[in-house]
Amino acid sequence: FQTPPDLCQLPQARGPCKAALLRYFYNSTSNACEPFTYGGCQGNNBNFETTEMCLRICEPPQQTDKS
């Protein structure tokens, strides 16, 4: 079992700028990618343009039953 990368554990971070960009962050509490408004600068690396990219990087791999 692999855990998501450290960047997926970061909180959402709007940043100090005033843009209103729709982005997605990985919520490690709910294990889901959730939308937030990004200001356009600074912030952190838990910031994805699409839910698909967020899930590809951060979603834990599904357990496969090998029985």
Swiss-Prot record:
Main location: secreted
Superkingdom assignment: Eukaryota
Glycosylation sites: N27
Compartments it resides in: Secreted
Keywords: Disulfide bond, Glycoprotein, Protease inhibitor, Secreted, Serine protease inhibitor
Residues annotated as domain BPTI/Kunitz inhibitor: 8-58
S-S pairs: C8-C58, C17-C41, C33-C54
Cross-referenced SMART domains: KU (SM00131)
GO MF annotation list: serine-type endopeptidase inhibitor activity
Marked site: Reactive bond for trypsin: K18, A19
CDD domains: Kunitz_ELP-like
Presence of keyword Repressor: no
UniProt-listed SUPFAM superfamilies: BPTI-like (SSF57362)
This protein's GO CC annotations: extracellular space
PANTHER family: COLOSTRUM TRYPSIN INHIBITOR, KUNITZ-TYPE PROTEASE INHIBITOR-RELATED
The protein's name in its UniProt record: Colostrum trypsin inhibitor
